[in-house]
Structure formats: C-alpha cells, structure tokens
Amino acid sequence: MSTLIPTASACYSLQLPPTEKDDRLNLNVRTGSASTLYNSLIFVHGGLTIGLELLNYTIPELNEIFYNRINISASKYKTVEKYLSGELFYLSLIERNWSRVVLEELEIRPKPRLLHQICAFNNCLYLFGGLALSQENDEDPTLVPCNDLWEFDLVLKKWTLLDDGSNYELDDAVPSPRFNHKLTVISSLSFANRKDHFGLFIAGGKDKQSNEIYDNSIFDLVEKRYVGSQPFRLVATTGDDTKDKETGLNEFVSNPEHFLNVDQTRNAILSITDDADTPNRKQNKNPSNHHESIVVYGPTRQTGDCQNSLVSFKVGKREIKGGKVLRLHKNSRVAKLKQSIIPYNLRYPTAGLFGQNVVLTGFLPDEYEISIFVYNRPTGKWSRLNIFCSHEYGSHRFWGGFAWQSHHKVILIGNSMTSRTTSSVRFFSIMLTVSLPITNILVSSELSKGRSNNRTSSFVSHGEQRHHRNKSQNDSLLKAELSLESTTEDSTDSSSDKTAESVLDAPVPLANSRRQSFSSLGSDKSPTAVSFSDYVHYAAPKTTYTTIRSVFPPEAITLGRNAFNRIGDLIADIELVSCNGDRIPVSSAVLMERWGQHFISLLAKGYINAVDKFETDQALGLDENQRLRSKSSNSESSSSDIPKLKLSLSESLLSSSSGEHDKKEKMGLSSAHKPQKDVPQFRLPFQDSSESVNREEGSDCSKDRKTGGSSVSTAIDPHHVMPRKNSTSSFQSNSSSLLTSHLQDIPPQLPLPDEQIPAVPAAPVSYRSASRKNSQDHSSPRSSLIHTLTVLRNIPVSKSPRESPFSSPRPSMSGPSGGSADLFSSPFPSLKANYGKPPSNLRKKSYDMNDGTIESSLDSFSSGKSSMAKVSSVPGENPDSDESSIGFQEFNKNPISMFDNALLNFDNIDSENFRMEPSLIPRKLYIPFMTLTVKAFCEYLYTGQIGNKWLLAPTLMDNLLISKFYRVPLLYDLISEILFGVIGKKEAYIIGEARKLKARYFKLLRGANIPIDSNYEFPMDEYDGFLDTVDDGYLDITLLKKASKIHADSVAMSLKKKSVTSNNSRNASIRKEGSTTAESVLEEGEKQEEIVSKDDEDESRTGSTSEEDEVDKEYGLVYLEAKDKSLPTIGPRSKSIFDRQGLAAIEKLEEEQNDHQVHSIVEGEDHENLITLDELVASDAPSDYAIDLIFETATLVTDMKMLLRTSNLKAMTAKFRKCKADIEKEMADIEYQLTQMPSGSRNLAMKSANQLKESQLQSKSSPIIPTVSTVTPSPLPSISGVPSPRLPQQQLPEAQLPKLTKSTSSLSRIASHTSFKALRSMTDVTPMEKSTSDKSFRGKLQQTMLSRTPTNRNEDQDSSSASSIKSSSKKRGIFGLLTGLKR
C-alpha cells in the first residue's frame, strides 16, 4: 500500500472546564451531543453524560443500552433526566481550553436533549430538533423527538425561541419532530422569491418511530418563519434510468421515489456559494451571478463502477433542482488507484470548505481510526491526508473533525485514554491539528478541461464589478477588526464584529454599532457618491490566483491597506529595521494579532531582558534614591511629595481605538502647567484623543498646586536633580524613566527660542533622510544624547497640527508612565525574578515560550546585543560591552529590596491586569532581509493577503523564508499555493506541448507511410499521467527514486569531469571559436572538440572534492547575493518619520527616483529579474528562471513536496527540449527526403526504411550510432522559442544547461547547514562565471542583478541535463531517435 505524504500535524492537550458536582455541568464524556465550529471556537451542546455505543440510532435501542448501562453501574440515579445535559460549552482553539456558558437560572433555554443539531451564522448559534424528555408523564419521562428551533445570541448570551413547531400538522412548511438529522445555512432563498434572505436548511433525520424522513424544511432567518407551501425534497434522479446509470445517480441509497434521506451517521451536508462577477450587466438588474448548491455526501451501493460519492443540488430561482453527481477526474492509468482514494460509505462524516476544496472527515468501514479526505472541485480529484502524531500509534481516538478555514487546518477532537470506541462516544481532552494541502489551482485548465480560471481572468480589474450582498450581510459588513480570529467559517459570514470568544464576554450588543459606515463617501448631493461597499471592492479586488479567501473579508483588507499606506506612521509604536537600514513603522497590536505567538514570545523575552538588565544595574550598587519609582508608589503618594503625570494634546491618535479604551482602566492625572505647543513631548502608545483632551483640560485645575517649585515627575527626573522650567530642553522635560545616575552629569541643554515655530507644511507623505550616516538632525538617532533615548523608542518630537502628517505616532506625555501602557493591558506572562541566571532562562506562564525552537537570530529581541533586535534598555558607559561580562553571582540580590517596586515584582500579578512599563518595551526589531521584503511583510500583516505587485525575487521568495523561519503559517500557505500553481501551470504546459508534438510526429509518420511499432513509447509519455496523481495525498516513490537517480548521475558525471586533463589555452581558443560560430552549423569534429573543451572547463573550475562543496555547486544559491542596486527604490513614506528632510531635498529625491524608473523602462534592464506576481501567474508557461527560484527557495525551507515537484519539473523541461529538438530534426529530415525523392522511388525507400527499423529493433543490446543526413534541408521556423531543428544543441555552454535535481540525502544535508549559511552572499558560485558571454556585459549584468536571484540564463538556450550532454551531441538518422529512446 502506498504511503501518505507526511503532513504538518500537531497534538495538544485541552484544558477542561472546572469540575462541578453535577456531572451535567462537566464535559468529560458525551453521547449524542451537537457540535459546530465558528470562527476559532468549537461549540458543544447537550448529550448524555455517559458513553453509549449506538449502532442503529433508534429510540428503542437507545433506551435499552442506556438502562442496561445504568443497571450494571453503581450510580444512584436511574432515570435519563439525571444524565441528560442542556449546557453549552465552547473550546478556544487559540487558548486550547474549554469553557461553559453560564446563564441566569431564570432565563429561558432549550430543554436538555441529544441527537440534535446546531450551526453558527452571523454571531448566532441555531439549534433544532433532537430527543428530549416528554412532559406528558412526569413520573416516567421518555425520550421523544422535538421540532423547536432556538437561537443563541453570542453577543447577548441569550437564548430565543424562534419557532416551537406546534403547528407542523397544519402547516406542511413546518418540519415534523425529528432527531439524528442535519442542519446547514443557505445564503440566498432565491427559490422562495427571497433572494436577499438567508436561512436554515433542515435535512432528513428520523421520526418518533425511528423511521427515515425524506422531507426537508427551510427557515427564513430574516422573516423568522418557515418558507414554502410544502416540504423540499432532494431528488436523486434525472428521470432517465440509463442516464442515471451513466452519471452514477443510481448508486446513491434512496427510497423508491429516488428521494435522499440525510442522516447524521451516514451523510454530510453543506452549502457552497460561487459568486461570479459580471461586469457587463447592468448593476440595477443583476449585480452578480449567485450560484449556490447544496452538496450532500451519502452512502452508495458500489456496483463496481468508479463514481463520486458527492451529489450536488443546485438552488435555482424557483426550486431546488435535481441531484447531479459531482464530476470525478478519470484516467485509465490511475482508475484503480482513484477508486481506492474515493471515500465510500463513511460513518459519522462531517464536511467543511477550504477554498475550492471540500474537506471530509469520517470513519471508513470496519475502521476505528478517523480519516481525512479532500475533494478539489475544479479538478474533480480526491486526495487523502495523513494523520500524524508524535505519540504512539493508536494511542489517540478521535470522534470527529472540523475544517478551520482561517488557519488552513483540520481540527480533530478526542481523547488519548480510551478504548476502541466509535464516534458515538465523544471525549474532549485532546486536539490534533492537520495542515490542509495547497493544491495546484492554476493548473485547472489541464485537469478540468477548461472549467477553471484562464489567463485572462487571473485578476478582477478595478472596474465596475460588484459583489452581491443581502441586507443582513450589509448590516455586518464593517464589523471586521484587525484580529485574525475575526475570520469566519464560510464566505457568506465573512465579517463579524468580534471573535466569538470576545463576543461571549461582551456585556452589551454591538451588532449595529457601525451601520452608519455604509453612508456614501461623497456628498449626499453628489451624483457620483460611492458607497463603502463599492469602494471596498475597488480597493480590495478579488483575485483568482488564490482560492484561500477566508483569511480576511474585503472590508478588513481595505481598512488594513488604508491603515498601512495612509496612517501607518501615526499608529505605529514599533519599527521593523531591514538590512538596508530602513525602518518601517508598524503597530505592535497588528504584530501581536497577525504575527501571533512568535512575536509575543519575542516581545516577552525582550521586555524581560530589559527588566533584568535594569534590575542588574540597580543591584550593582546604584544609590537607593536613584532607583525607578514604582507605579504603586506614584499612585499612592500625595501630590506634594511626588508630582502627578502630565499629558498633552496629541494629534497622532487613532480615533477608532476609542472603543477599546472605554473598556480599560482610566488614570487619574494632574498637571502643573499646560504644555507648550512647541515643546517636544514623550509619546506613549494608543492613547485616545478624547482622553488626552480631557486630561489636558483637567490639568488646568492643578496649576496652583504647591510643589515648592519642584514640579518635575520622577519618571522625567527620577533623581530630583533639577526642577523643571517652562521652556526646558527636550532632554530635561522628556527624559526616560530609565535614566540612571550616570545621566545626571550631562549638562542641561539651552532653552528653546521664545518665538513660535511655524507650522509644518502638510506634505502628502512623511520623509526622512535617505542615509542616516553623519546625520546632524536633532532627532536623528546618531545624536549622542538622543541615541540613548532612541533605543527606548522615546524620541521627542514637536507637536504638529492635526492635519499634518508629521504628527506624533503616539500621544505626548511627560511624567511617569506607570499604569499607562494600555496597549499591553492584555494578558501577558506572569514572570518570576531571575536569580543568578541569564535572562534567556526566563519562562512565562500564560504563553508557552518553548513552543518550537526559536531561531537564535530572533531570540535577541531584547535589550542585549544581538543580530535580530538591537535594543538597549539602559544606557551603559561602554556600549560595546557584553552583558555576559556581568557576574550574576558576584552579588547577592535582596528579594525584599528588589521587589518593593511594582515594576519588578512579578509575584502574585494578575495577568489580566498586568501592564508593561512603556520605557522598557523594545521598540525596534531587526529583520535581516531587504527593505522591499520587510515592507511587503508589513503589508501582509495589515491586509492579510499577498500583493499582486510583489517582485518574485526578492520579495515573494524572502517572505516564504520569513514565514517558515519566523513561524507565520498563514503567509506560508498563501505563498505556497501560488508557487504550486506556478509549478502546475508549467507542468501542464509541457505535457500539453508534448502531446501536440507527439500528434504532429505520428501524423507525419502516417503520412509518409512509415509504420509505427505498437510497443513504441514516446519519450514524454512517462509524464502523461503525472498530473493525475500529483495531489492525491500519497507519496510518489517513483519521483523520489528518480530524484535520487538523477543526483547520482550528476555526481558521477562531475567526478568523471574531474579526471579529465586538458590544456587551458586550448580550452580558451575552442570556447572562443564555439561562441563566435553559435549561429552556424558545426562539423562533427568541431562538436566533439567543443564537448571536450566543456569537460576541461568544468574541470578547471572544480576545486574541492568534499561533499559540501559538491552540494554548494549543485545548488547555486546565487539568489542570496546581496546586490540590490537594480531594485526599485521605495517611497520615502516607507521610512521612518523621525529623520526628516526639507521640501527641496524631498522633491529632488522624487525626481531622482522618477528618472531612475524611466531609465529602467527605456533601457529594459533586469526585466526578467523584476517579474511581479501578476505577470508570473498570468503566464501560460512560467520561465525557467522562476522555476529555479522556487527550487532554491524550497531547498532553504526544506519543503520536500515543493522541492520534488520543482526538481521533477526541471528534469521534465530538459527532457522535453531535447526531445523536441531531436523530433523536429527528424521530422525535417523526413519532410526533406520526401520532397527530394521521386514519386516512383518513394515506395522503395519506405521499404528500406522498414527493414532498417526492424534490424535496429532486433539488436537492442548493441549501441546504434545515428546516421547523419548529408543533404541540408530547407530551414524551418523555430517553434515556441526552441532553436531550429538543424541548429546543434551542443553549442550551448554548460553553465546555461539546467541543473539537475538532487537526492533527498543531499537535501537533508542542505537543510542542516544551509538555513543560516544561506543568509550570507554566495558571490563565488554565480553561474555567470561559466558563461561564454562578453565580460563587460557579464559585469554589467552582475551589477544590476537582484540580491536574491539564482541564475540569469536565457530559457530559450536551456538544453538537456548533464547526463545527456554527450548523447545529445550525436546526430541521429531518421529512425535513430526511435531506437535510442526505446532502449
């Protein structure tokens, strides 16, 4: 049996809710519970609190098993009532803990029940049906089906009864009481004349006699009533038995009327919506094509034919149409393999969506292990996912799975301490995450026969396309926050006000808090007023080169792009520093929410290192009165002893954050003087403008406070060195709270001038100097004094008008910052002090800092010296001194004296209310990549998508490295999907061209009456079925063997070249002769000499024989060269706003940039190197340059699947080009000989040719030297960039030949030592050194080469692999190719 491809799986233990005395309030085990996934939460409701193994799911069976279990147990409760729960629990997939929703005792709620269904939509849970206790006989209640429909508002935490179902006997639209049914959401009720409404589809189930129900009902969630005059049925027939047999509809289990029953234990159901924009239609008639279908997975009879197990029912304008089996990709070569992959008759199946894929989980017949299958709708291909866990095989037992769209994973829930039980018994203590595969969405034209995206529809233009949205969706369009968990489960519920978890904690509803945002952007009187919905789809058009659309809704993308491009400087409080020295300001809230756990760990380490260094400096003998005052002492002391804080009005505030600050604790502030407008102020992150105004106004009340002239804050002057004056310097009034005793000797600066500074002109963007070297700007970080403050990110700047883009990114403040870091009021690690150990040994409680190995370059996001984060929390006397030189054991720290201040006391701290000291928070993070790459990474963090203008190198490739090494899995999946699509398009192109070439060749042979051997195989036939099995989830052993064989052949060839000796002068002359005669036909002897010269040339460039040198040569990592001269310059806005230039310098810089861009366009320099993403995916045949880039990057990130695909593609490309050149040469020879022969002698020639062919086939063991035609045929036009068939391929220098793939052993070796070695430049391995081109041209090309480009070879000159260089140099006769290839 084939092996499944290993997947990125992870197993986690889950924390159960607190144990209660009543077992119905616990979540230990459940039977018949209902569950669903919404956003990043899994909800579980109801069920029995004991595990029962049910087989047929009938009421008599349930009662029998239950009472048998109770009678043999020692429980004192003997009735169902004591075991039937009605509680609602939810699992946070981020925090990995279960919680119970606590309601008031008197609030209405559904009755406890089991075998019911729940689903989630638009911040609400919906519950229907199930088995509940009857109320007719209170003495002996029994389980009966019910048909009541409930809604649970996640905002209000309140249950609402939508319909009690009492009139189902009078109204056919009301569903009858049922259990064991299914429930799903329909986004449009167009068949019921309510296309703008959405509703619930209640399917199947069993009645009170446990008989199957074939009636289905639909509930309108807008009008809150059932629709239709009669039940809806799922009809699995076309009316023609013959057609049903052909399509496979007769295979589905149904009743005699061909109605399908949907059962919880055998079926899965989901709705799929496809929106196709139609720009040519009038907007007032039909804004979009809204295609919705109900897809049902059901049991089949399996008569032997390979049919799909999914049937689709299209929701039409007037009715739900008959079923249609989803097409299945068929191929005669892999028919048996495909039949083994298709999941038939799964038990307890659940279905979900991921892009264009249907994710199906369930249990195969006679198996207790859960399985995961993925069906790709455009291609019709099934694949199976491998479920891997580091624990012992079979130690876990999972009962069900959910598709977690926003994180591209499948979630499995179960237990590790159970026996072999079915999904009827459910436990909740273990969670396993399985990464969903990234398939070739761009190769759909090859597999789906034209049903996929084509080249012209790769992008939706910024035109008049609109998305159709209903009223209810419009109500929640703008409820998208920056949090990643706001992504939703399906495309119709694309934006929620909060994550479901935060919604559950909200005390008041927020459903319509931002509905007014739908007002027109223009004036009410303007005839061209544009709604926000129209603007959203203009600013964030939907792209078709990626199917992962659930990361963020268009509204969040639009708001994020505006925040990044327009007000990114104003809301930023951290800077990302590139290897070019440029600084990109970014908000730490965005980094924490979008980057996630890895950044939080880095920030925690950096903060703890800063605190530890401060603690160390204090313990080394600093005076007691020079220590930082604690926040508690500041708040408890009187105003006469310690002055209060002083805040000033700041224009850099983000008004949209006011809602967040309303929930946070306010600070009581007072001030001695209202700050002057031109006095630089310190800034703290995320202070609300309204709060600043109130504080500023409130500060007037404290002007007359009696401070004896000592009105300086301890955070500004903790040592009470000098009183503050009204017009003091920026240093005196804005010192950091970390200034220690060695700063008190710095003399004060002179007062600022009394005259008012003119307002800063409102320029369109913010600028800083292009180079920070020798900068004498007063705000430059190179200044000797301000450099001390720059490392703390407290750079004083003057206040600017509100309209100015130069306004401060954070509110200004002078005074102690205790308790004011509202940004970091979220739960943060509770840490204990470090005694005698380096800061790196600190661990945090709330977050697992050991979750994977953090790269050494990232561990230093701290105050210490590092290559990743150059942050210094306390200015030292020797900035170059190492922290490790401090002897931690040379002094004894006094715990009592050290923890008398709240900053350093981490004991007994409430993580919910913990606030970090702003002056100790690291403010710069160095990322060792180029500015374009870092800026693109920030763009992804703000928008959640990949920009179509990203350069392939270095931007896209470097971001793949960032996502791998710095753990950004969503970005890795987005890039991988695009790269696999590019690989797939190239594969499909080559296979398509090979088929065309084969058809032309065979047509010519038939026209010339040349017989074709029935056993003959075309050279490219081995790849014909490759795309049929490439994404089936199984490991391609043939591909691994092929890669290993190619690597072995490559190494053998290189060793053979080393043993060849030659004369270097003779080599040079022959190379020169070969380069000057590249356009003429060489004689046979000249070709042989050229081959020898190439061997000698390779030998002269082979220095070391070590294995690592071989690897370095095989993997020419030229793409890591740090040469960025030809990269397009970034706008000044991408640089920090704290180093500024005059307007004249700004205009000059813009002119230089424009001139450079115009010159680049005119000259056409580096056009291939500057290929963008939209150009890459729009091409039918991506260049070999792009494939080489993907191959090298896959090597660095050790993505085995991508690496094998690219290596196979490179070998496929080389073989196809060699085959095409030889075949076209043979075709030219045949055509010429046919034209030169007289008509009477053709038959004789054909007879001789047949005899020659037979003699060649009989002597397979002996080598046959191909014959050479002595007559030169007429020249033929070159096809698809391939050289003329008469042009010898042997003239190409070997440096331009495509490199061969490597074996897995060498790849593993590279993975062990190349990850960080690759971050240095590899200038000695550039393939241009092997080129025979002119030296001046080569030097110019190297100067303008991208910093991360592998090769700059012309793909039209690429030839066959190294193993076939000599064989390709020999001319073949008419039938020589056939004989040689068959052998």
Swiss-Prot record:
- Record region (Disordered): 450-506, 625-644, 653-825, 858-884, 1063-1114, 1251-1289, 1321-1369
GO terms of molecular function: peroxidase activity
What is its subcellular localisation? Cytoplasm
Q: What residue spans carry the Polar residues bias annotation?
A: 450-460, 1341-1352
Keyword check for Iron-sulfur, yes or no.
no
One GO term of the cellular component aspect? cytosol
Q: What happens when the gene is disrupted?
A: Results in attenuated keratomycosis.
Source domain of life is Eukaryota
Record-linked InterPro entries: Kelch-typ_b-propeller
Question: Does Repeat appear among the keywords?
Answer: yes
Compositional bias, Basic and acidic residues, is annotated for 693-707, 1084-1094
Q: Which cysteines are joined by disulfide bonds?
A: none
The UniProt keyword set, sorted, is: Cytoplasm, Kelch repeat, Meiosis, Repeat, Sporulation, Virulence
**Start-end of Low complexity biased regions:** 631-644, 726-758, 803-815, 858-874, 1251-1280
**Which GO biological process annotations does it have?**
cell redox homeostasis; cellular response to heat; cellular response to pH; chlamydospore formation; filamentous growth; filamentous growth of a population of unicellular organisms; filamentous growth of a population of unicellular organisms in response to chemical stimulus; filamentous growth of a population of unicellular organisms in response to heat
Task: Give start and end residues of every Kelch repeat.
Answer: 124-179, 199-246, 356-402
* PANTHER family tied to this protein: MCG48959-RELATED (PTHR43503), NEGATIVE REGULATOR OF SPORULATION MDS3-RELATED (PTHR43503:SF2)
What is the role of this chain?
Negatively regulates early sporulation-specific genes. TOR signaling pathway component that contributes to morphogenesis as a regulator of this key morphogenetic pathway. Required for growth and hyphal formation at pH 9, for full virulence in a mouse model of systemic infection and for biofilm formation. Involved in chlamydospore formation, distinctive morphological feature of the fungal pathogen C.albicans that can be induced to form in oxygen-limited environments and has been reported in clinical specimens.
Q: How does it assemble?
A: Interacts with SIT4.
- Protein's recorded name: Negative regulator of sporulation MDS3
| Source organism per UniProt | Candida albicans (strain SC5314 / ATCC MYA-2876)
